[in-house]
Amino acid sequence: DGATFEENAMIKATEIAKIANQMPEYKNAVVLADDSGLEIDYLNKEPGIYSARYMGEDTSYDIKNQTLLDRLEGVPDEKRTARFVCAIAAAMPDGSCEVVRGTMEGIIGHEIAGENGFGYDPIFFLPEYGCTSAELSPEKKNELSHRGEGLRKIRKILEHK
């Protein structure tokens, strides 16, 4: 395991690329991999790179979300800043690896809201839109999301290779 989203994405991409390069049909393939998660500033960027495993992999996101809300009980909005992070790595056929970071900034809301999305989306509040990530339309979420930003960045790099 790496210590950052970027390191984890690079490890995934380069390990898969090693396997792919042994198969003739994938010899010159570009391999993409990502590592994503939620950083909450007040909680020293927890859950961070452990977002999926926070409180154990078998713990439901309903419980994870409620636990985070409980930990932030009484914390004012200006100290509830958070971001979704997505690092995307592209392992190139020549052995090099490009990595980018996409982010979506917001705050942790005060309640679980919304049915769209998954994971921490129901507690991730976007003040400028007045709703959680789970309340956005799929189209709007793709436009604003950390993954969408990361994919747009890596695409720009790959188009110039």
Go through the PLM ranges and name each one.
Residues 1-161:
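Anionic-ligand binding patches
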